[in-house]
Amino acid sequence: MCTSLTLETADRKHVLARTMDFAFQLGTEVILYPRRYSWNSEADGRAHQTQYAFIGMGRKLGNILFADGINESGLSCAALYFPGYAEYEKTIREDTVHIVPHEFVTWVLSVCQSLEDVKEKIRSLTIVEKKLDLLDTVLPLHWILSDRTGRNLTIEPRADGLKVYDNQPGVMTNSPDFIWHVTNLQQYTGIRPKQLESKEMGGLALSAFGQGLGTVGLPGDYTPPSRFVRAVYLKEHLEPAADETKGVTAAFQILANMTIPKGAVITEEDEIHYTQYTSVMCNETGNYYFHHYDNRQIQKVNLFHEDLDCLEPKVFSAKAEESIHELN
């Protein structure tokens, strides 16, 4: 599954953050795609060339499969599961660009520089149904995108084409569709951070056992609707972040409330579904932050510290084991 959200800091930095929740061990790494790098789409074999360099979390499978990333123009994107709702074209349409679902992040970050650019270019995009060999299934995906304006988009593939929504909450999870999640928020308008006052009932003076009574009814389970509501609530009432570092910390703190520990969710196939990594990327600085399940220390790679005109993709080896800062 997965949860994603965006934040704006007081100094106008914009971050896109996500959890990667999955049962299959993805084995992802941070990878840089340089400018003018050619890759061939599995849809039609056509060669594509990157206009913009980008960095993100991915895995090499012939082409590199990216789950999320940020490019040099400040456009960021994350792919999340959309089971039961994602529908793709069965055949190639003439006079359009053809890609398969798991190539969308690569395509959009390599040729688009803003959300307006995305809106324009997807008019001539066809996403063709094709299995990802690694999982032997067609990945049902939808995508959240952000840029330096602070605006956000959600793109969902449906039977009648690609649906593009301005994502005002700046939150996305999984199925149902985005409009359903936004409508569902109306059920939670009474939830608030402020403690409720003591009250007299039946001749008794009643007061809360402790803080948090205003959040009674805030869903705490791991289903997509509950995670969506929880993320919107936490983002809405978050103490403003002064700068990028504070914003990144805040994003990790919010997503910690959606993180799934091993054993808490078991699939129908008796597989452990858990949060494999959490990442946060800043649209202005090109910083890509992340931590893995087995190492909670935040690690960082900066896009602009690299040669963006290098000839081949570059893989960054992350420390997998827990890193503990010892004080004595």
Curated annotation (Swiss-Prot):
<keyword id="KW-0046">Antibiotic resistance</keyword>
<protein>
    <recommendedName>
        <fullName>Penicillin V acylase</fullName>
        <ecNumber>3.5.1.11</ecNumber>
    </recommendedName>
</protein>
<dbReference type="GO" id="GO:0016787">
    <property type="term" value="F:hydrolase activity"/>
</dbReference>
<keyword id="KW-0378">Hydrolase</keyword>
<dbReference type="InterPro" id="IPR029055">
    <property type="entry name" value="Ntn_hydrolases_N"/>
</dbReference>
<feature type="active site" description="Nucleophile">
    <location>
        <position position="2"/>
    </location>
</feature>
<dbReference type="InterPro" id="IPR052193">
    <property type="entry name" value="Peptidase_C59"/>
</dbReference>
<comment type="subunit">
    <text>Homotetramer.</text>
</comment>
<comment type="function">
    <text>Catalyzes the hydrolysis of penicillin V to 6-aminopenicillanate (6-APA). Can also use the synthetic chromogenic substrate 2-nitro-5-(phenoxyacetamido)-benzoic acid (NIPOAB). Shows negligible activity with penicillin G, and no activity toward ampicillin, amoxicillin or cephalosporin. Lacks any detectable conjugated bile acid hydrolase (CBH) activity.</text>
</comment>
<dbReference type="InterPro" id="IPR029132">
    <property type="entry name" value="CBAH/NAAA_C"/>
</dbReference>
<comment type="similarity">
    <text>Belongs to the peptidase C59 family.</text>
</comment>
<dbReference type="Pfam" id="PF02275">
    <property type="entry name" value="CBAH"/>
</dbReference>
<dbReference type="GO" id="GO:0046677">
    <property type="term" value="P:response to antibiotic"/>
</dbReference>
